[in-house]
Amino acid sequence: MVETVNTLRREAFSKLNAVRNIKKNQIEGYFSERFGDIQVLSGNRHVVQALEAINRAFVTEGGSGQTGWTQAVAEFGPWLEQYGKEYGYYDLFLISRNGDVVYTVAKEKDLGENLIKGSLATSGLGRMFNKALTTSVLVFILHSRLLREI
């Protein structure tokens, strides 16, 4: 009887370990794909041009919603929106080196905020942005409920 229980226990732990390894591989694969997405986006000439044009208008006009900003968003926004839809992202951000959120696909209240000295400086997004400024390592930001916990 004891031997049967021990055998069943070993089999159960073996199955649990197998499931754990499968899940681990799935999670690692998911994050590997997301890092690949980031590398493609960050090196994409279109994204670089979008950030430059939208940021230039944002700085020149003192924020979002003005004519130059709207024109830049009309030019580059559809491509960014399509990219987000294709890859299942809820939102994509363009953030200047100064910490200004100059564009978001979702255009929520974080648009126009500053991640260094604004109300979002202590948010998960603000902390991750500040961490990205101080490291040469690629920082991956999850925009989700988990972000609020970081």
For the regions a language model picked out, list residue spans one by one.
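Juxtamembrane extracytoplasmic/periplasmic/luminal helical "stalk" adjacent to the first N-terminal
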Residues: 1-74, 81-90, 97, 138-140
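Extracytoplasmic/periplasmic ligand-binding sensor regions of membrane-associated signaling proteins
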Residues: 74-150
